[in-house]
Swiss-Prot record:
Record's keyword terms, sorted: Cytoplasm, Elongation factor, GTP-binding, Nucleotide-binding, Protein biosynthesis
Pfam families assigned to the protein according to its UniProt record, in alphabetical order: EFG_C (PF00679), EFG_III (PF14492), EFG_IV (PF03764), GTP_EFTU (PF00009), GTP_EFTU_D2 (PF03144)
Highest rank taxon of the organism: Archaea
PANTHER family according to UniProt: ELONGATION FACTOR-LIKE GTPASE 1, TRANSLATION ELONGATION FACTOR-RELATED
The protein's name: Elongation factor 2
Function as written in the Swiss-Prot or TrEMBL entry: Catalyzes the GTP-dependent ribosomal translocation step during translation elongation. During this step, the ribosome changes from the pre-translocational (PRE) to the post-translocational (POST) state as the newly formed A-site-bound peptidyl-tRNA and P-site-bound deacylated tRNA move to the P and E sites, respectively. Catalyzes the coordinated movement of the two tRNA molecules, the mRNA and conformational changes in the ribosome.
Endpoints of the signal sequence: none
Amino acid sequence: MTRRKKMVERVTELMDKPDRIRNIGIVAHIDHGKTTLSDNLLAGAGMISEELAGRQLFMDSDEEEQARGITIDASNVSMVHTYGGEEYLINMIDTPGHVDFGGDVTRAMRAVDGAVVVVDAVEGTMPQTETVLRQALKEGVRPVLFINKVDRLVNELKVDEQEMQIRLAKVIDKVNKLIKGMNEKMYNDGWKLDAAKGTVAFGSALYNWAVSVPFMKSSGVSFKDVFEKCNAGDMKWLSKNSPLHAVLLDMVVKHLPNPLQAQDRRIHIIWHGDYNTPEGKAMVACDPNGPVCMMVTDISFDPHAGEVATGRLFSGTLRRGTECYIIGAAKRANRLAQVGIFMGAERIEVEALPAGNIAAVTGLKDAIVGSTVTSLIEMTPFESLKHYSEPVMTVAVEAKSMKDLPKLVEVLRQIAKEDPTVQVSINEETGEHLISGMGELHLEIITGRIKRDKGVDILTSPPIVVYRETITGSVGPVEGKSPNRHNRFYIELEPMDPAIVKMILDGEISMNQQAIERRDALVAAGMDKDEAKNVKAIEATNMFIDMTKGIQYLNETMELVLDGWREALRGGPLADELVQNLKIRLVDVKLHEDAIHRGPAQVIPAVRSAVKAGVLMAGDSLLEPIQKIQITVPSEQMGAATSQIQGRRGQVFDMLSEGDTMTIVGKAPVAELFGFAGDIRSATEGRAMWSTEFAGFELVPAGIVNDVVKDIRKRKGLKEQIPRPDDYLA
């Protein structure tokens, strides 16, 4: 029997035993060694040959990933590990570390219950370490720590044995500080990392060895051995006497929760329905006999089988032919064609897959990433996936030849389905297709894939920055009249309270919640009680509140009112960019009694023009995306590095020195960061390590805002003159 076939048999035997399953993600800052670690774990479990591990990049199955040497998508694989004489099924997802692919990390964290956080012993915690850790804790995913590249401390920094231990302890302290700062309750509930308890391991993924305190006690390998063997370059001895996969997977099995333990805690974080319903009880208990409840965390395209939806199954059992509904899509049943699990790029079919596993299924035509899939016709959907960064750059793409246009439209639809951090839209005026993404690299990869995988030749524009609009003052009531003059809507506008905006972004307030729960959360955040109980809709970080009382026909017209409001948010009056942080109160309405005179063609334009006019009256302002920058350089290069930030309308707000290196933390607008990579390299003679991460939107400075608005309007083919409120209300 082949090694692979044997592995598949062992995997399928363990699927029905949730207490023997561990769903884990491997997360880290870029280049801290996640994929090398994943490969060596697979080799240890007998999935790929040991010689190739670490160089095979089994998890990086995409050509682009292998060529660039970075992970772009999250990859799944199932394997078996023996611990204490028992076999355990480990479903592992390797995630990208580059800031532009943070969306993949968010999605992976929904599917898993535990995370191995990988940190480079020399570089320590970096911005992306912080981001991935925050995402894990937010999803209720328990972390353990692997400090990688320990050999570099000895061979490159030439530290002695005592200094090595001090440095490793510092990394643990830093990660614990992050956990405590992000969620003190979890930290106090035993999520604090502790080398003595075995929730931390040290080693080298590349050279295939690791140690942990419990392993040292049982095997007799000591820190002294580690130091001496690293010093002598004898990695073979270390990998033979303390193999990476044994130490790490032992830690995973012993300290990370199984689906039964995890779901009891996590369901309350990721699902806000009624816990006394059949689906609520089944998910908390991880019950294979309950209704099917699955959350789609990834969609990929298989040339033979079509769309493959991967996701975490929280209750029920999936079989071929199972009829499922996708909440929020058309009310038609999708029949599962194939049910399976992933082994790297390969999909292995299975007869049945019970709750607690990560499933790969075909046949869910209506699903997108983030969909709730269930055998019930109706259920409260899972909380939507909250991404920590937002699209900050856009490129326009067009097909080189007209005959490829239908194919391009289809490919863009597919990309929007596969990667929810990408926004695809069509510029109605020019007919261009616009793709918005997380950064230059993200857009480069997407446009490259359109050409390579999908075979469509395209032309792309240089990247453009994504702006937003918001208001700085309050105004109202503003009157919006329908074209036939028979319907009138009166609205008041004011900026959203920043505390409530944060709660919306963190997923603590949403329209999926029970109304009472939402009202109480808003009142606790300082909102007026009457407003809090009349929230009709939340769109991005905008809120619509109905403060009217007993107006005839309004109930049946409300959906059209909200459509008009949403249309106005899609393009503000200043630069036709998305509007954010806007609170609108509907305070009075006069409607024609005849339904034919208050249809969509009357109501939608009336509300839309009132909102746009109100936004102008309340001080419409332009916001630009900002990135946090962290640069680590030798001390003598500090001046060159800080001037790179300050010369780009940036600010430096922290400088930390450790030994002879300096870490500079600052922020700068995305618009000024084009070409930053090349400039920082040449300014510091290639000795800088840097990383960026999304840090929200800020007002464009008054001195340049008019020029920026003019440029955007010109690019979009809009009139140069900014409209006045009367243009909308006339």
